[in-house]
């Protein structure tokens, strides 16, 4: 059984202290045993190895590896990968995240074409592009996102593009640049309920993130919007329901809810493992509140089954519009 996978242990890249900003923090409690419902297959298939080879050959970074995603074996076996642009070093230090923190390197201006070439070689029908936070850049990396989307459109015109962005806090005009590139899905994760932001996501602002998602719809109503949260961080059910209402007020289409898994003893503790029946209850409630699509399971992650979910999103929108069109 594998839960949080250390796929970086054989990484040929130079070793750096992964979380220097967390070194001074007291150790957090670590759950000795994970419940039976959190089980994943360890990676190692031929398709997984081929996907890894293409990623390595192009010198690319994937959030699948950097964040220790438990679904990497399943996704890479299907040749699904979430590419992380603008380097592997984040300017923020969220208490839940396994991505390293520090001063990032300069942007690789050839990266958009490298990503696009990999997408074409993997034959991806749907690709997810995410990034570290780049508060050091004037536009937060918005133009780099736009160039990456454009490069994928040129190299693989049939591929739909989903982006998972940072919040572009205090980066005027950045969001407009990204939306103008016309991704098919715009995802920005709230991550947790507002009461937990100071301890879980201290560099962000909850209502700024909600407004970011709302603004995407105002700029281009055709773009699907999506957001995700983790549970098991000490949130209350009523707080999660209020978060759903906040997202619906921003006209967000798709909500993902998954179990938080602790990357190390220096990260936020797992307050509890939420049982599958509670995830099902969240899913039922979210659909009742009007989301087009909801994915709520212990192993749900933002990019998990993203291609299949995009097809389901399209079908859900069409079903919603059909009665109005026939009236």
From Swiss-Prot:
Write out the GO MF terms. 4 iron, 4 sulfur cluster binding; lipoate synthase activity; metal ion binding
Listed under GO cellular component are: cytoplasm
Q: Which InterPro entries match?
A: Aldolase_TIM, Elp3/MiaA/NifB-like_rSAM, Lipoyl_synth, rSAM
Q: Which residues bind [4Fe-4S] cluster 1?
A: 64, 69, 75, 303
Q: What is its EC number?
A: 2.8.1.8
SMART domains with a match to the protein in the record: Elp3
Question: Radical SAM core domain spans which residues?
Answer: 76-292
Record's subcellular location = Cytoplasm
Cofactor(s) listed in the protein's UniProt record: [4Fe-4S] cluster
For the keyword Manganese, the answer is no
Keywords carried by this UniProt record: 4Fe-4S, Cytoplasm, Iron, Iron-sulfur, Metal-binding, S-adenosyl-L-methionine, Transferase
Where along this sequence does the record place binding of [4Fe-4S] cluster 2?
A: 90, 94, 97
Region of interest (Disordered), ranges: 1-32
Compositionally biased spans, kind Basic and acidic residues: 8-32
Q: What class of enzyme is it?
A: transferase
Annotated pathway: Protein modification; protein lipoylation via endogenous pathway; protein N(6)-(lipoyl)lysine from octanoyl-[acyl-carrier-protein]: step 2/2
- Binding note for cofactor: Binds 2 [4Fe-4S] clusters per subunit. One cluster is coordinated with 3 cysteines and an exchangeable S-adenosyl-L-methionine.
The domain of life is Bacteria
Q: Catalytic activity annotated for this protein?
A: [[Fe-S] cluster scaffold protein carrying a second [4Fe-4S](2+) cluster] + N(6)-octanoyl-L-lysyl-[protein] + 2 oxidized [2Fe-2S]-[ferredoxin] + 2 S-adenosyl-L-methionine + 4 H(+) = [[Fe-S] cluster scaffold protein] + N(6)-[(R)-dihydrolipoyl]-L-lysyl-[protein] + 4 Fe(3+) + 2 hydrogen sulfide + 2 5'-deoxyadenosine + 2 L-methionine + 2 reduced [2Fe-2S]-[ferredoxin]
Keyword hit for S-adenosyl-L-methionine? yes
Q: Which family does it belong to?
A: Belongs to the radical SAM superfamily. Lipoyl synthase family.
Name of the molecule in the record:
Lipoyl synthase
Identify the gene encoding this protein. lipA
